[in-house]
Amino acid sequence: MSPGNWKTTMVVRGILLILYGLLLQPEPGTATLPLLMDSVIQALAELERKSPATEAGHIASMWLLSAQGSGAHNPLPRFLLEGQSLKTAKLAPPSLSPEFQGLIEEVARHGVQDGKEYGVVLAPDGSTVAVEPLLAGLEAGLQGHRVVNLPLDSTATFPDIGATVPDLKATSSAHKDTSADVNSADVGTLSPNVRDTDVDAEVTFLDVRPSSTGVQVTSPDVQVSSPDTKAKSPTTVDSLLMVTLARDLGLHFLQGAQTESNSGLGTEGCWDQLSLPRTFTLLDPEASPLTMAFLNGALDGALLGDYLSKVPEPRPPLSHLLNQYYGAGVAGDPGLRSNFRRQNGAALTLTPNLTQQVWGTLILLQRLEPAHPQLQGMSQEQLAQVATHAAKEFTEAFLGCPAIHPRCRWGAAPYRGSPKPLKLPLGFLYIHHTYVPARPCTDFALCAANMRSMQRFHLDTQGWDDIGYSFVVGSDGYVYEGRGWHWVGAHTRDHNSRGFGVALIGNYTAELPSEAALRAVRDELPHCAVRAGLLQPDYALLGHRQLVRTDCPGDALFNMLRTWPRFNMNVKPRTARRASGRSKRRLPLMIPLATDLQ
């Protein structure tokens, strides 16, 4: 690596860890900025502008260690970071405006308390993102996509207190000048289920090295689904997945058995306002810390960390990278953006590998913190079962489901009157197109505006109690909640109580929706509804025109529906009545002949 590229890398890492370190220097009376991802990006840009290149490389890891010591105890970032003892240097981060200082203090620690979620921001795509796991993933990626070798024998112990990981300073070309002195007060203590007689005289040390092939899967023959199978411990864990997802997934599922339909993952919430958000209230006041915002931030951190670990030098400034990721796409790739985090995350966190990562992370935590109340006394087989359950639930209940924006996110007006509950599970999905709006919406602002427009039309012109559809699918990667899973809609006349009405925004008479929108309707939405007991396993899919005289959902889309496995071809389409030319001219411009009016 050239000296210039090395300096660039050190500056980028320094900026990130200065952001952590500023938590230790609160300023009284700081002004408040809206809790937007754009505000975080502006703060990063300010840090990048003020940080001298000669200092950034030396203070990066130390700032993260300092911030780690100021919050809830999590030994993994401290254990993984390279750098000298904090006592060897005095740190002097650049001064920021009171507004940016206050923002950094407010968002860099994630937490859930009294039904409120803290440390989260609203992103341009409409999603809410926890900043802490995002920053952890960026830092792990800047270190290089590294693999941590666990002891080959599950009963082996870690080095005694004060032991130095050998050759650590040569593990990454970006950090060759960094001497390692990785200490932990707990690493020399035996795991609760380790016998003294089992400890090999030659202790296996942890080795951290860059992974040239991405995430490594170890022990591929392990069978962790059966409690009667003696599990073999994984031999490596990936540091990127460890600090973003694996630790929190493992600890979450250690807390108690979860049902198949309610894993406690991904609780959504509502902002006090969308233009200047300040307070985020969870829809479930008893939600676990693994909220939708946390999982979004963790996935974003893992994806961007993976990108940073592979992108050639010089690496982009973090503010530039985040601006692209939460905008049009990283490096001009519209697929690599926050709208499609779940699809991209599914490729990065394949279930067998994620099981190994969660299991290995729990093993590492058990060695680092033998007195951990959740890990104490847990056998390897028990940890394997927890990891298997965690990976399965995360993959099926989160990655395999569409991202659904709740009503409050698009600014829905309240329901008029009292909604009528559905008798679940239902047996049908009824597919519509909106016709008006005719153009597919490809960003949150336009999709949300379309939702509000349709709701106003359904309320004020049609005289309905709410927007008619159960769900509406945009071309921005998101599904928008209409009446939702539990309330009778107004979408398919005489059939509203028998099925969910799902509309795709756009006119699909001659063109097809995006592949992402089709996948959400064909695969993701029904899969998750069946899994949650909302839709019958033998459900059927019908086009609107099969039940009502209408051209909906458009010829192109309907012909596509006919090729889908769940399509019920036994119900023949009903031909739409055509109005005379005179009556057509009398129709309001906002209500075309083929528009979806039940």
Curated annotation (Swiss-Prot):
The keyword Transit peptide does not apply. It is found in: Secreted; Membrane. Glycans are attached at N353, N507. Disulfide bonds join C441-C447. Residues 1-31 form the signal peptide. The record marks Y469 as: Important for catalytic activity. The keyword Lipoprotein does not apply. The modification Phosphoserine is found at S261. It catalyses: Hydrolyzes the link between N-acetylmuramoyl residues and L-amino acid residues in certain cell-wall glycopeptides. One of its GO terms (molecular function) is peptidoglycan immune receptor activity. Its main location: secreted. Gene3D superfamilies: Peptidoglycan recognition protein-like. Coiled coil: none annotated. Its EC number is 3.5.1.28. Residues 172-194, 212-233 are annotated as: Disordered. Zn(2+) binds at H432, H544, C552. GO terms for cellular component: extracellular region; membrane. Belongs to the N-acetylmuramoyl-L-alanine amidase 2 family. PANTHER family: N-ACETYLMURAMOYL-L-ALANINE AMIDASE, PEPTIDOGLYCAN RECOGNITION PROTEIN. May play a scavenger role by digesting biologically active peptidoglycan (PGN) into biologically inactive fragments. Has no direct bacteriolytic activity. This is N-acetylmuramoyl-L-alanine amidase. The gene is PGLYRP2.
